[in-house]
Structure formats: C-alpha cells, structure tokens
C-alpha cells in the first residue's frame, strides 16, 4: 500500500522567477508556479497512530510546510519508474534506523502547480520538458500515479540468440538490437567460438563479451598494429607509452596492471583507529602514492550532473580498489566543451553551428556537470584541488581542410591521488574456493551498455540506448564502502581483501570475469544472490547494469566473518555471489529458472580476440597566417580575459570542498584575496609531517589542429611548468597520467595520434626522465547530426591531457603567483627562445582564427634545465612568486599575478622583440618569477648555470597601487587599472553564477571584486598563538577520552580526532551503529564531538536524519540525554554535527534558543576560507579567544541560521549565546555574500549553551588546526594555527 505525505516548498523564490523567465522567453503564458516536495511511502503493513506521527515527523524537514492548498494544474516530477533514486535509498535507511520496519521504501517527487493561460498539448510538453530531466525523471499528472514507482514485475528469463539456426545474421541482428558495437571480425570470432561449443549464445553472453571487449575496456586502438602511409610501424601506441617506464622505472611501484598506478611516497605517521579498541593513533610507515585519471565524456554529454558525478565516483573507486585496498585523498577535474554562448553575454567568436538533439548544450554541461562532479567529491569527502576548463568550437582550415572542430562531445576529466600501504601495493593470490563478493548498493536497471556506448561516435547509437547508458550517483554509499576498505587495509597483514576491482563499464559482466581472470582463476556464480531492488530485471540487466558505488572482491572463506562484521558496522551492503574455481571457466546459475545464463570458457570472453590493424594516411595542416588587421592590444586584452579558458574559474572552484581531510596545503585559491590561480595542488602526506603530494595539469589541445606532436609536447611541458612551483627535487619523482581523446577514423587523426604518442612516449618523456605509468583513451570524439537535409559533424581536436603527480619534500615551500610589493624584480624565463608563435592561441581563437605556426617545446635540454633551476630556487627560498605562461600568454600571466597580489604592475617588454602583440599573447612555454631586487643577480646566476642565460628577460616589477602598465622603449604599449582587468576577468564566472545560483549573491560577489580598498583576509588575535594552555594537563599523563562520533556519510572524523589527539585526548572512533547496537555507550567519555560530512547524504534535511535516529530510539536517546546532563562533560558539533545537534535541543540543557540551519541563501554548496570573529559567550571551548578575528574553512550547503522570528533572534543575542560571527575584511559583522557564505542573520555561525559546555558551529576548525592547512596565513605562524586553541581549551577545561 502507498501513503502520500506533503513536504516543504521545493523551490526558492529566485528559482521560481528563473523558471517563469524561461517560460516567458519561450512565449508560454505561465502566470504562477508553486512547487513542493511530496513523499510516497510504500508500506508492507499499516502504521499505528504513533508510528504514523513518527513518519510524519521524519518527513518534516527544510522550510516550513505550506498551509495553503496549492492551486493550478499538477505536474508531478518523480524518478523514472523502475529506478530507485539516491534520495530513496538513504531516506529508507533512516526510516529503518528509526525503527519503522513497515516502510518498504520511501520515494520523493516534486509537485509543480502551474497556473497558466490556454496552452496547447505541444506547449504543455514544452513546460514539462523544462521541469524534468528525461534521462532520470518522469512526469505524472496525478499524485496516485506515483504507485507506478513501487510496481514489481515478474523476473524474465535469459534470451537465446539462434546462431545455429540462422547463422551469422542472428549475431548481426543482436548486435544492432542490443547496441553492442561489435566489429565484423568480432562477429566472425563469436560465430566460430559458439559453433565450436555447439550451442547458441545467450543475449547475456553476447552483452558481456561486447562490454569486456569494447574499445572503452580493451583499448584496441592503443594495442593495434599500425601502417602509416603504407609503412608498417614498429610499435603499438601502448608500447610507446610503456617505453617511458622502460627508460625511467625509478620510483614506480605498480604500472599498467591495476586500477591506478603507484609510486614511492614518504615515511609518515598515518593516522587511524585501532580495530579492537577504536583508539586513534599515528602509525609510522611509508605512505605510497597512487594516481589515476579517468574520463566520462559520453554520459556527461547526455545528462551532465549524473555523468560528471559518476565520472568522479568511478575514478574514486579505481583508487580505492588499487592493490589490496587503498585510500583516495584528493581530486582534480577538467572540462572541454564547445562555446558557452551565455545568454546576454555572447562573445564575438561564438557562432551557433547547431548540435544533435540527443546531447545537451555546452552551457548546460558547464552549469550542471561541475556541480555533479563537485557534489560527488563533497559528499564522499575528497577535496577537489585542481582542474582545467577549455571552450573550443570553430570552423577551421586544419589537416582535413575547412571543417567544424569543437567539443560537442565534451571531455569530462576526473582524477586524483591516494595513498596505499607498502604491503598492499600488489594484489594477492585468489585461492580456489575464495568467496567472490560484491560490495555496495543493489543492482538497478540503469547504465546499461556504457562501455559500448562510450566507444561509439555520438550519433551512431539509438537514442534509447543513450538513455539506458546514463548512470546515477550515490556518493554516501561509496563512502560507506570506502570505510570498509579502510578498515580492511588498516588491519595490515590481517587484511581480508585478497583481490579487489571496482565495478564500472559493463557492470559485473566486466568486473567479475576481470577479477577472477587477473587472479588466475575461474568462477561460478549465482545470479539471484546479487543484491537487487528490482525483481523484474532480466538476467542480462542484473549482470550487466552499471549501478554505481560497487566493488568486486575476493575474500578468503575463513575471513568472511571478519569482513561481515566490518560491513555491518559501516552499514555497507554486500553479497557473496560465487566462489573461485581451479578451472578457467565462467558459469552463472539462475536459481529462479534453474538454468545457466552463462557457461563459457574464460578464454572465449577474454582470450585472443582479433587484433586490430590501423592502416592510415598522414595529412598536413593547411593553417593560414594570423591576420592582424583591426586587432588592437586593448581589444585583445578584453577579449582574451573573457575567453572561458583564460577567465576566472571561481564558479567552478567554490562549489567544491577544498579543506576536508585537514591535509590540504595548497588549493586553487591564493592569498588574502582568494584568487583562483594556483599553479598546482599540494597535500600533506599525513597530519604530522611536511612531506606531501602534488598534482598539476597540462593541456594545449587546439595546437593539434596545426601540429599534433607539438600539442602533445606542450601538454607535458605545461604540466611540468605548473608542478615545478613546489619542492619535489629530482624530475624522476614526477609521474604522468596521459589521457588521450581523438576522433579515430576521421581523416588524418589516426596518423596524428600516432605522431603525438611517439613524440611523448619515444622522444620527450625519455629525454626528460619522465614516466607515464597510467592513462586512458577515448577514441570516439565526434558528433553527427542532421540540420534539414544537411549532414553535420563536429570533431574534437586531438586532445592530450597530462596530469603530473609527485612526492613533495616540504609542502611549506610551495610558491604561488601572489606578488609582493617589496623591492622586487620580475623575470620572464622564455622557453620559446623568442619564437613567440601565435598559432592556435587564445588570441587567435577570440578573433576566430587558427593561425599557422604554434608554440612548441623548442629545446628539451632547456626545459629540463628550467625545471632543475626552479627546484634549486624553491629549495633556496629565492622566489617570492611564480606563475607559468600558458593560455593567454605573458599578458595573462602578469595579470593573474597582480590579481593575487592586489597590486600594480610596471612592466617593460622591450627585450622581447618588436612584435608587441606576439610578445604579450604568445603561449610558448615559460614562467614569470618574482625575486627580491637584492637576489636578482644570484637568481640569474642559478638560471645561467642551468643553461637558461639566453631565456631570461627582466620584465619590470610589481608596485603598490592599481595601475597595470606595460611599456617598451619608453612608449606605453598598454595601460589599464588592475581593478578593471580583474572585473573583465571575472565576468564569465559572474554570468555563470547568475544563471546557476542566486543572482543577488552573484552580483554581491562580483561587486566586491571591484573594491580596490579591500584589505583582504587579515588576522587579529587576542591570545598568544604559541601558548599551549593544555601543556600542564598533558604533562600529567592523563588522556581524557573523547567520542569522535560519526554516522554513515560523515567524512571529517579523522582530522577531528587528530586535533583532539594533539591537545592531549584519547580520541575514540564511535559509529552510530555501535550505539544503536549497544556495542558502545557514552558513559565512559568525558567529551563528545559530532563531525562534519553528509550523514545520509543530507536527505531529510542536513543532520536531521541523524538526529531523528537518536530521538526515535529510546535507549540511544537516553544515552545522549544522560551525557548532556552530566556535569564536567564537553560537546562540540561541527558542520553536519552542528546541524544534527541543533535538532537535539530537547536533550541539551540550555539550548532551547538554538536556531535551525537551512539552505544557504546562494542555494549552493559553499566552500570558502572565511573571516570570523570570536564573540563574548559562555562557550568553554572559546575561552580566552574573545575579540579574535581569523579565517576558517567553510564547507556546507545548509548553514544559514533560521530563527522563528525577530524576537527569537533578539533572545539568542541578549542571552549571549552567539559564539562566532562572519565579518568582512574590514572587520565588520556582515550578511553580504561571500564574506557571509550562507546569509545567516547578524553573521551568526556558532552558538553555545548557557553553561558553555556544548558549542556548535558551521565552520571547520579541525581542518585548519595546522598552519600548513590554511589556504592563506601570516608568515610568522608556526606549526599550530590559532584554531588549535579550541581543542587545547577543551583539554584545559577537563583538568
């Protein structure tokens, strides 16, 4: 039976206004819109009155429910029938954890009530199209129609393909019907294999073969034989990549054989809790570094949010499934799309060339895709610290004559680093009889055929197959699985995981054969043991769907009880679905129909399928020289600063958590003005050291339209000039991931791909001492469609994205682009050797040209010398600022450095040649360094020692003030105020934020950027940062116990434990499942801290589901009430823990006036480094800190204080319960965005109880307790940042 319960309003006023504006623009006479959530409960038994009240209370969250009866025509948007939304999975978990076992499932829809003039059926279809994502959702016209969400269908049996009766044609028909993308020779192979077996294949076997042998999974082109211009080539593409490892194997521990590559890290204290006691401690051991970069292009073109989210999620799983289990740590993301054409902000180079109906626009991708990628990383708890963004779409005269080149099929790049124990780097042995396990969520009828779909050019497959290949994301489930993997690797030798892979393209049909085959075994499986929420799925759908957040593992049979215990504690679902066999055979039994849908020798599936040969021709580019007529430097500057590739990326940065883990030493945002211009991302290797890891990206795809090899060389060069900004040492410590995107089969592109791979794999990287131990290829970068009777094609440029990773010697020595105005000199190191080529530059693009000659690596020895010289100068602390020259050229390099330093530039380019335009906009490799005037001679000597004397040019100095002036020989070449340039550079991000977020907030942020008087972040402390008030108490040897409390989805507990540990506590890991099961109580603890993250993925309100699982369980409720009433206890709630504890007011004495915390005014997750002041309050944790003003990490989507009315706010203030407030850079309490990131009244961001024993706050002190993890800090701070005082106060209070 289904019950319907009304929910809170679903859309903020500005979202409704945006919808109305869209309807008006489409000339649809819609007058009013009201939207509210509607909940549907599928019950297996009736609820009594108490249970019903409990369910109603559970589903009461967010803004107050509307009292009026809605008016207008109902359009009910729900998840597609036959799918289960992430919201449903998590809300149902909460209901069960609150004791409501009668609830089979909860689901949620949005009911839109629309009042409109007379609309035709076609116009109503336009309205519904605006309200839902057809890939994920459906529209009903009555609430009762939602019954379809819970419809159950009978299982369907496997289908046989009549090969023996109908011959080869049966396979050809199945290939088209199922969208298998099989080549002719593969059809021949299958015909031969099944004829020899003497039976017909089942659809599931063909599907499994297609996925396992798709280009996506098998990389056929990279393993192919090559004939170019009639000449047989000696090596495959992959062999040329492997050549880099053969030449420079140094420091690589694993390459080409696992889900990620591994290189040597540093010996540090890894911090985690003991399995038996729950006590956190440091474990001194090597923390080796793993690296992986994936792409998820096809799904992102179809449905950008889930496409980008599952792209990030899949890459995170690759990291976790490395070796015998590893820990993902920090991420990067990238996008290449066609022109944005932002409404009202269209640029002169942006022409509309049309697109296929089935894919979304570049603007849609960049509105939704980055949010999906960021949301997954945020909820999983991985900081996103690096990225790139390129737009390109133009009709150009390239290798193949005049044609359309651009990114209608986008690049969505997701990558990152992690850490792994030395003894877990290599996979283990799979014993015969080992249990084969699926860890993670249930099978669902989604994401079918993603591997094969990704391997086709967009436009070749049926639209319904595109629809089927989109996946959905549930990062909170992946977090639970990762917690299990963490518990396993933390056991060291007792790790129960023998072998692990992630489930990606092809689902279990690819993952399980790969698992057993890699382990040298076969496998027998039971289909019906696979967890599934949809009983009506066919065997093919159960085995081959790409439901996310799953891993496959081999676990020794005698270790299964331990594994079961770990999974139950973390509430991570798992199923034992088979066991490993001696015989290399794959069998899948179906208990329901008592038949064998799969019964195959493994070598039929993964054996010697036909090898591809590429027989291709070379084409030379025909580019025309850059036409200069009408180009002025002033106009060029404004255009280039508006090009999204160059323009400010804040709209892509602040949506992503950049502080979680407490180990982020360098994020994108630089300096007191938080400008997103960092050269590279840097993390600390642990919470107790200055060793670290660095990541950087290099990419110059448009250059490939003129010169394939130069484009590839520049990508490597740019990655190197970016990562050089931190202290790495020997260049052999740097390892690269190469992600290759090409339109295979397009005239000239295959030969160009070979040329590019050869340039990097055979020549440049071996000469530099660089290794490429990991990478990925995507070979179908083309879209086709029809405009009227005309056939259209958009082909991407050959695109190589290089991600560089390295161990860091000392993270404190990372150099940023932030200029200083002390007596200084700016030096350009020009690795272009004066060539100043303008082909395929940002300048050429904004004037709709390509040019003829591009930049290139002009001298490999000088590039190596450059890296070594910069490393020497970094180690000697001789550099004040550093920024590489890249998109936009020297002009942009200097401008970004000035923005970061909030200063002026007095530049002189006389020594850079007579062509001023080329000197300023050429994108040859190089960098600008700032040095003290007194050090200039010594610095130039170091550069000369490394063979760079002829590359060094003095180009002026940074000056205080607002002027940005470039001269040559006494003549002004360009002059403008830095503030004006800053505003131009910011306009793209402003327009994107206005479209996507609350436009009022976007306007406030943009306005703030034009304030030259802004002093930036600054610090005023009322206490001595170096005083350790806990020291006398630590000296006693007593270590009070603090319960570090987490719920499923919490992700900030480790850094929280480390902060308390440093202050003299024994930090104990306490999961809510421990309390609910009675394994642990709170009676033995002196302090309790509820940590940040996304408990239950923030469904049912941020922290509210967590709180209700306490309030609705009598024993646990009493446990918390007793703790809060016990004198001499302390409690802290941070972020999600703050939201949770604000909902426990009925249990916490003196908290009656606490507010609720609701959706930010911006309607967006906000990750900021914000200034707060400590106010006078009873809070025991903030004693001695009153009056201090200091920055702190902020990361939340629901942090806005909501009070009942003005009287409630006045009472909260008059009782003195406000503990922290947001202030602007002038020290004034603020409600203005983004200084106040959530819009809380009076800047309130922390409150306390009347006794001061319980304090809750939205910002994260535990992420910045070390100075090194602050995005910016005064230079005189030592190891501990000022927020360490909170934790020491806690220790002092407990005596």
Swiss-Prot record:
UniProt catalytic activity: N(2)-formyl-N(1)-(5-phospho-beta-D-ribosyl)glycinamide + L-glutamine + ATP + H2O = 2-formamido-N(1)-(5-O-phospho-beta-D-ribosyl)acetamidine + L-glutamate + ADP + phosphate + H(+)
Predominant location: cytoplasm
EC number: 6.3.5.3
One biological process term in Gene Ontology: 'de novo' IMP biosynthetic process
Region annotated Disordered, chain positions: 305-327
Entry binding sites for ATP: 307-318, 678, 886
rRNA-binding in keyword set: no
InterPro entries (alphabetical): Class_I_gatase-like (IPR029062), FGAR-AT_N (IPR040707), FGAR-AT_PurM_N-like (IPR055181), PurL_large (IPR010073), PurL_linker (IPR041609), PurM-like_C_dom (IPR010918), PurM-like_C_sf (IPR036676), PurM-like_N_sf (IPR036921)
Active site (record annotation): 1135, 1260, 1262
Keyword Transit peptide: no
Subunit structure: Monomer.
Function field: Phosphoribosylformylglycinamidine synthase involved in the purines biosynthetic pathway. Catalyzes the ATP-dependent conversion of formylglycinamide ribonucleotide (FGAR) and glutamine to yield formylglycinamidine ribonucleotide (FGAM) and glutamate.
Protein name (Swiss-Prot/TrEMBL): Phosphoribosylformylglycinamidine synthase
Source species of the chain: Escherichia coli O6:K15:H31 (strain 536 / UPEC)
């Amino acid at each position: 039976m289904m019950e319907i319960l009304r929910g809170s309003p679903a859309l903020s006023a500005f979202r409704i206004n945006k919808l109305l504006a869209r309807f008006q623009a489409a000339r649809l006479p819609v007058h009013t819109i009201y939207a509210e959530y509607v909940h549907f409960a599928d019950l297996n038994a009736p609820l009594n009155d108490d249970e019903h009240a409990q369910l109603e209370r559970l589903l009461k969250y967010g803004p107050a429910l509307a009292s009026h009866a809605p008016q207008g025509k109902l359009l009910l948007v729900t998840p597609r029938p036959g799918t289960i939304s992430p919201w449903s999975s998590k809300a149902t978990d909460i209901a069960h954890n609150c004791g409501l076992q009668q609830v089979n499932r909860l689901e949620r829809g949005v009911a839109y009530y629309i009042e409109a003039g007379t609309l035709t059926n076609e116009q109503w279809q336009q309205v519904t199209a605006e309200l839902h994502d057809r890939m994920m959702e459906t529209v009903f016209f009555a609430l009762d129609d939602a019954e379809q969400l819970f419809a159950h269908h009978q299982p369907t049996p496997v289908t046989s393909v009549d090969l023996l009766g109908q011959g080869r044609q049966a396979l050809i028909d199945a290939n088209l019907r199922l969208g298998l993308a099989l080549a002719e020779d593969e059809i021949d192979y299958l015909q031969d294999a099944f004829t020899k077996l003497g039976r017909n294949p089942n659809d599931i076997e063909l599907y499994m073969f297609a996925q396992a042998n798709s280009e996506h999974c098998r990389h056929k082109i990279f393993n192919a034989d090559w004939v170019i211009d009639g000449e047989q080539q000696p090596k495959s593409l992959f062999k040329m990549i492997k050549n880099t490892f053969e030449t420079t194997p140094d420091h690589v521990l694993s390459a080409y054989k696992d889900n990620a590559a591994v290189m040597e890290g540093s010996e540090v204290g890894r911090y985690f809790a003991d399995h038996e006691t729950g006590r956190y401690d440091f474990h001194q051991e090597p923390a080796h570094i793993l690296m992986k970069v994936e792409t998820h292009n096809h799904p992102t073109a179809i449905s950008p949010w889930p496409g980008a989210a599952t792209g990030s999620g899949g890459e995170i799983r690759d990291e976790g499934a490395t070796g015998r289990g590893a820990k993902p740590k920090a991420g990067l993301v990238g996008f290449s799309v066609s022109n944005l054409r932002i409404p009202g902000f269209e640029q002169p180079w942006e022409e509309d060339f049309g697109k296929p109906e089935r894919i979304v626009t570049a603007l849609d991708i960049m509105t939704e895709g980055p949010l999906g990628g960021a949301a997954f990383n945020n909820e999983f708890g991985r900081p996103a610290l690096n990225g790139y963004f390129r737009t390109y779409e133009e009709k150009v005269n390239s290798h193949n004559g005049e044609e359309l080149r651009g990114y209608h099929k986008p690049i969505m790049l997701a990558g990152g680093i992690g850490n792994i124990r030395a003894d877990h780097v290599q996979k283990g042995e799979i014993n015969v009889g080992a249990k084969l396990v699926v860890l993670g969520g249930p099978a669902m009828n989604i994401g079918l055929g993603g591997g094969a779909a990704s391997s086709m050019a967009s436009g070749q497959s049926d639209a319904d197959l595109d629809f089927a290949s989109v996946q959905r994301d549930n990062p909170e489930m992946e977090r639970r699985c990762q917690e299990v993997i963490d518990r396993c690797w933390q056991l060291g030798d007792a790790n129960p995981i023998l072998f692990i892979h992630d489930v990606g393209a092809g689902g279990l049909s690819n993952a399980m054969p790969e698992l057993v085959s890699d382990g040298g075994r076969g496998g027998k499986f039971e289909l019906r043991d696979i967890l599934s929420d949809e009983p009506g799925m066919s065997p093919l759908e159960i085995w081959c769907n790409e439901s996310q957040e799953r891993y496959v593992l081999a676990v020794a049979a005698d270790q299964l009880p331990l594994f079961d215990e770990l999974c139950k504690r973390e509430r991570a679902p798992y199923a034992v679905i088979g066991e490993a066999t001696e015989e290399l055979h794959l069998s899948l039994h179906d208990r329901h129909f008592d038949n064998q849908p799969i019964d195959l020798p493994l070598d039929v599936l993964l054996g010697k399928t036909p090898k591809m040969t590429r027989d291709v021709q070379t084409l030379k580019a025909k580019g025309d020289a850059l036409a200069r007529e009408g180009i002025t430097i002033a106009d060029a500057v404004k255009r280039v600063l508006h090009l999204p590739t160059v323009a400010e990326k804040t709209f892509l940065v602040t949506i992503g958590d950049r502080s979680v883990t407490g180990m982020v030493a360098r994020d994108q945002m630089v300096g007191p003005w938080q400008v997103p211009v960092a050269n590279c991302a840097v993390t600390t290797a642990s919470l107790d050291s200055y060793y670290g890891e660095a990541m950087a990206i290099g990419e110059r795809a448009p250059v490939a339209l003129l010169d394939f090899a130069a484009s590839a060389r520049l990508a490597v060069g740019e990655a190197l000039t970016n990562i050089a900004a931190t202290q790495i040492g020997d260049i052999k410590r740097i390892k690269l991931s190469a992600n290759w995107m090409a339109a295979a089969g397009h005239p000239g592109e295959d030969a160009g791909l070979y040329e590019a791979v050869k340039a990097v794999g055979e020549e440049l990287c071996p000469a530099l001492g660089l290794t490429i131990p990991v990478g990925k290829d995507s070979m179908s970068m083309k879209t086709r469609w029809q405009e009227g009777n005309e056939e259209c094609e958009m082909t991407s440029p050959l695109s190589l994205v290089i991600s560089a990773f390295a161990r860091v010697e000392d993270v404190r020595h990372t150099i940023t682009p932030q200029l200083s105005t002390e007596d200084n000199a700016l030096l350009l190191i020009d690795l272009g050797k004066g060539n100043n080529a303008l082909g395929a530059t940002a300048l050429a693009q904004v004037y709709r040209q390509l040019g003829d000659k591009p930049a290139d690596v002009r001298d490999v020895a000088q590039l190596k010398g450059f890296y070594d010289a910069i490393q020497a100068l970094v180690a000697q602390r001789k550099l004040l600022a550093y920024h590489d020259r890249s998109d936009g050229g020297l002009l942009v390099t200097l401008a970004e450095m000035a923005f970061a330093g909030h200063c002026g530039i007095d530049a002189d380019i006389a020594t850079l040649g007579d062509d001023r335009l080329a000197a300023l906009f050429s994108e040859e490799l190089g960098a600008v360094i700032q040095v003290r005037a007194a050090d200039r001679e010594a610095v130039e000597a170091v550069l000369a020692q490394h063979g760079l004397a002829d590359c060094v040019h003095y180009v002026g100095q940074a000056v205080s003030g607002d002027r940005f002036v470039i001269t040559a020989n006494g003549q002004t070449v360009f002059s403008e105020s830095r503030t004006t340039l800053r505003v131009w550079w910011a306009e793209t991000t402003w327009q994107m934020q206005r479209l996507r977020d609350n436009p009022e907030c976007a306007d406030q942020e943009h306005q703030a950027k034009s304030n030259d008087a802004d002093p930036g972040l600054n610090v005023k402390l009322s206490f001595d940062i170096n005083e350790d008030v806990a020291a006398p108490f630590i000296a006693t040897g007593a270590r009070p116990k603090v319960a570090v409390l987490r719920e499923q989805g919490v992700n900030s507990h480790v850094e929280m434990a480390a902060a308390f540990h440093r202050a003299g506590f024994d930090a104990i890991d306490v999961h809510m499942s421990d309390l609910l099961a009675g394994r642990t109580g709170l009676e033995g603890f002196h302090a309790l801290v509820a940590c940040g993250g996304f408990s239950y993925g923030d469904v049912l309100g941020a922290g509210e589901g967590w709180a209700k699982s306490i309030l609705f369980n009598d024993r646990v409720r009493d446990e918390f009430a007793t703790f809060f009433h016990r004198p001499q206890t302390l409690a802290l709630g941070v972020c999600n823990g703050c939201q949770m504890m604000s909902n426990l007011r009925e249990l916490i004495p003196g908290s009656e006036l606490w507010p609720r915390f609701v959706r930010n005014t911006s309607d967006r997750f906000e990750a900021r480094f914000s200034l707060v002041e400590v106010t006078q309050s009873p809070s025991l944790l903030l004693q001695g800190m009153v009056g201090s003003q200091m920055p702190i990490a902020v990361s939340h989507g629901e942090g806005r204080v909501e009070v009942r009315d003005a009287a409630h706010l006045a009472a909260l203030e008059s009782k003195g319960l406000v503990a922290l407030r947001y202030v602007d850079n002038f020290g004034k309490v603020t409600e203005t965005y983004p200084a106040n990131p959530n819009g809380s009244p009076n800047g309130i961001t922390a409150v306390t109880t009347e006794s001061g024993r319980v304090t809750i706050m939205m910002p994260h002190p535990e992420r910045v307790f070390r100075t090194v993890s602050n995005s910016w800090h005064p230079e005189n701070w030592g190891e501990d940042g000022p927020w360490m005082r909170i934790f020491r106060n806690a220790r002092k209070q407990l005596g």
